[in-house]
């Protein structure tokens, strides 16, 4: 059914696509985070900063942790996941907006954490997200799998729920702007395979 979808390990040359897809997966949150670095002269634009971050060799959540889905001759989606080790306990949030997510992550040390799973809008609904999710579950190598999504992201909540993920905890999101829509961050987990 999804034989038209090919998965491959990302390479450094995919950094631009990874930045775009990570931003899509985060519904613009990644761009907001990268904006501060652009304002400080690290890059000209937030997207350029995202590309630089995704091209780093040693950074968790960069190209080395990413799997690309291709369909119909183009990059269609990405999943970025890694083992969440004890080192997360030493990380402190540097801005209030990341504190709730970091606190949730600290409760699932030892799991395989999916930091991003995104598919271009015109290619959604044909199994690409499911295929990327299945691949991440396989990469977990019998560890529990965890992820965080927004409480108002119904498509993501549905996909994860249909694939054995259960809500483990919630934390109110810190609004990015005064008029931002209110939501919570939802930690979802799936038992070890």
For the regions a language model picked out, list residue spans one by one.
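Glycine-rich acetyl-CoA-binding "A-motif" of GNAT/NAT acetyltransferases
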Residues: 74-77, 155
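Conserved GNAT-fold acetyl-CoA-binding loop/helix
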Residues: 27-54, 65
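Conserved acetyl-CoA-binding loop-helix of GNAT-fold acetyltransferases
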Residues: 119, 125-138, 158-162
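Conserved acyl-donor/pantetheine-binding loop and adjacent beta-alpha core of acyl/acetyltransferases
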Residues: 80-116
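A short helix-loop-beta-strand connector motif used in the catalytic cores of GNAT acetyltransferases and
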Residues: 53-68, 84-89, 113
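Conserved GNAT acetyl-CoA-binding A-motif
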Residues: 110-112, 133, 139-152
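C-terminal "cap" of GNAT-fold acetyltransferases
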Residues: 143-154, 161-163, 170-193
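Conserved N-terminal entry element of GNAT/NAT acetyltransferase domains
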Residues: 1-16, 24, 28-36, 191-193
């Amino acid at each position: 059914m999804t034989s038209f979808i090919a998965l491959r390990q990302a390479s450094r040359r995919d950094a631009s696509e990874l930045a775009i897809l990570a931003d899509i997966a985060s519904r613009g949150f990644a761009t907001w985070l990268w904006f501060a670095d652009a304002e400080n002269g690290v890059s000209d634009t937030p997207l350029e900063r995202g590309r630089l971050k995704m091209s780093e060799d040693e950074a968790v959540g960069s190209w080395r942790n990413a799997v690309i889905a291709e369909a119909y001759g183009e990059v269609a989606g990405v999943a970025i996941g890694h083992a969440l080790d004890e080192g997360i306990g030493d990380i402190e949030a540097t801005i209030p907006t990341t504190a709730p997510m970091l606190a949730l992550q600290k409760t699932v040390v030892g799991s395989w954490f999916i930091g991003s799973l995104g598919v271009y809008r015109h290619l959604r609904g044909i199994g690409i997200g499911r295929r990327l999710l299945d691949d991440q579950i396989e990469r977990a190598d019998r560890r529990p799998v965890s992820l965080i999504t927004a409480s108002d992201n119904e498509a993501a909540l549905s996909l994860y729920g249909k694939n054995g993920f259960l809500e483990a905890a919630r934390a109110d999101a810190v609004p990015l702007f005064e008029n931002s829509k209110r939501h919570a961050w939802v930690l979802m987990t799936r038992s070890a395979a």
